Amino acid sequence: MPPVLHVARRSDWEAAEASGTYPVPGGAPFIHCCLPDQLAGVLERFFAGADDLLQLTIDPRGLPLVVEAAEDGAGDFPHLHGPLPVASVVDVRPL
């Protein structure tokens, strides 16, 4: 699998760096991820007008990632079923 992306709020990422893991958001069954060609659509649908966002590039090797269909029919997306180890994030960029 190619690298996958996750859009994170800066404050959430800073907390993850301090603890060593980025947790599954409260109440969610997984961490939502996307492939590079899906990023623009994710930003438009879920983060329009948001600021202080970061693009996390994740090395998927060894992670419990499952590609699943989006509930809204927007396509198949990688979902991380479990917390994200900070060490698996290979690049962080502001959006």
Feature map (PLM): residue ranges:
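Conserved, structured core segments of small domains
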Residues: 1-95
